[in-house]
């Protein structure tokens, strides 16, 4: 019977090693007999030292990470990260199990003589998160009445996203108005002195009879008022002077 128990104690740890770390813990916590093997097997995953330092079998963890801010670094650490505010020197520390270290370029220049050659060194690039965006300044000034917003610059299809904010300066105000060329109004050309409204089929053209064979457009009373307001004659005097009551109608 004793031989069977000894055989059980030798074979069962070998079987447990094929399980994942999560399954190992679940299996060995099912009963007190199996819990005996909890410090007899190895754990493959990487664990934080601050969460397992109270255990008596920390040497059973194959990978243990630690972030150091001073020289007090445990000897069981395998993955070491030096904090930005790390003070001290690695020359006073011993790392029998260290396989990986992460530090800045300045920290590496200070402690490179104390790092063994068989250790993997990770030095992050501080400029890897920066990127340059090139753009044509001429496109920016093409539409000066727009404000550069987000990813849109100008009215052209330079970017797909068209986020437009109108400028509140005086240029945008006068740009959006229908500006009248008063110089031309003061000395109008002969062909521009008379502006006639369009002639509809229901109306007479120079007192000529309307051809009733053509289809006539029936308009409502509101539509007739609309046409009367927007298509009335604009009277411009012939004395080359702008009338006082001049007004430009627009839709």
UniProtKB/Swiss-Prot annotation:
UniProt xrefs under SMART domains: FBOX
InterPro entries found in the cross-reference section: F-box_dom
Annotated CDD domains: F-box_SF
Compositionally skewed regions (Basic residues) per UniProt: 241-251
Alphabetical list of Pfam families matching this protein: F-box
Polar residues: bias regions: 202-217
Record region (Disordered): 188-251
Domain F-box: 1-46
Name of this protein: Putative F-box protein L166
Natural source organism: Acanthamoeba polyphaga mimivirus
Lineage: Viruses, Varidnaviria, Bamfordvirae, Nucleocytoviricota, Megaviricetes
